[in-house]
Swiss-Prot record:
Listed GO CC annotations: cytosol
Keywords of this entry: Carbohydrate metabolism, Chloride, Hydrolase, Magnesium, Metal-binding
Family, as annotated: Belongs to the HAD-like hydrolase superfamily. CbbY/CbbZ/Gph/YieH family.
Cofactor: Mg(2+); chloride
PANTHER family named in the record: PHOSPHOGLYCOLATE PHOSPHATASE
Reactions catalysed: 2-phosphoglycolate + H2O = glycolate + phosphate
Name the UniProt record assigns to this protein: Phosphoglycolate phosphatase
Keyword Hydrolase in record: yes
Function noted in UniProt: Specifically catalyzes the dephosphorylation of 2-phosphoglycolate. Is involved in the dissimilation of the intracellular 2-phosphoglycolate formed during the DNA repair of 3'-phosphoglycolate ends, a major class of DNA lesions induced by oxidative stress.
EC assignment: 3.1.3.18
UniProt xrefs under InterPro entries: HAD-like_hydrolase_sf, HAD-like_sf, HAD-SF_hydro_IA, HAD_2, HAD_sf, PGP-like_dom2, PGPase_prok
Lineage: Bacteria, Pseudomonadati, Pseudomonadota, Gammaproteobacteria, Enterobacterales
Length: 252
């Protein structure tokens, strides 16, 4: 807990930390797969693919769907499908479809987790500088933050297209710290996944791991963050601010 004593700013992951984006992501993935006449995956499975950016999400979806189709065809006594299109091109096509569909469903399929809005407001009001670091494609980030009414809290926002190396590489965290005008040691990073904690460690930032997000089926403790919290508003007393017990509901 000593690492939180000299904090001047806080940066956050987005998906699985501030927002439950799985409904929108899963819907877009399934619509893209369906458009290519591939099996659809469903939200429970898509959740396990979230966290490394859209291209990796497409690779995971395509790998699963291709294997699932092969299994189904074998069960029905049908021959396997000959793929004339290289795997890289299939991923590109799937990504293009995903971007189209996600643009249509992102806002209605993304919800703030409990206590996020009031906690961000309290942190911002306290004078702490706030940043956002996400592997989500950059064009989707700003509209989503605006629709959820939390864009006003962030001085710096880094999306997946704004850096050459996404998390778990330290580059995006180092960039946020630099733009916030502080050292990595002065910036707390809050996330829900192995990638988040690895990025924080590599950048030299103290880290908070949240237990409720998307972490590939792993408990966040295995990544050894400096602090682990079950609720987002536990950040407030840790940073010397009054604890908020206001319960929020998902946005409509």
């Amino acid at each position: 807990m000593n690492k939180l004593q000299n904090i001047r700013g806080v940066a956050f992951d987005l998906d699985g930390t501030l927002v439950d984006s799985a409904p929108g992501l899963a819907a877009a993935v399934d619509m893209a797969l369906y458009a290519l006449e591939l099996p659809v995956a469903g939200e429970e499975r898509v959740i396990t693919w979230i966290g490394n950016g859209a291209d990796v999400l497409m690779e995971r979806a395509l790998t699963w769907a291709s294997q699932e189709r092969a299994t189904l065809r074998k069960t029905m006594g049908k021959p396997p499908v000959d793929e004339d299109i290289p795997a890289e091109e299939q991923v590109r096509i799937l990504r293009k479809l995903f971007d189209k569909y996600y643009g249509e469903v992102a806002e209605e399929g993304t919800f703030l987790f409990p206590h996020v809005a009031d906690t961000l407001g309290a942190l911002h009001a306290s004078g702490l500088s706030l940043g956002l670091v996400t592997n989500k494609p950059t064009p989707f980030v700003a509209p989503l933050l605006e629709s959820l009414d939390i864009a006003k809290y962030f001085s710096v926002v880094i999306g997946g297209d704004d850096v050459q190396n996404k998390k778990p590489h330290p580059e995006p965290l180092l960039l946020v710290a630099s733009r916030l005008g502080m050292t990595p040691e002065q910036m707390l990073f809050v996330g829900d996944s192995r990638n988040d904690i690895q990025a924080a460690k590599a950048a030299g930032c103290p880290s908070v791991g949240l237990t409720y997000g998307y972490n590939y089926g792993e408990v966040i403790a295995l990544s050894e963050p400096d602090v682990i919290y079950d609720s987002f508003n536990d950040l407030l007393p840790a940073l010397g601010l009054p604890h908020s017990d206001n319960q929020e509901i998902k946005n409509d």
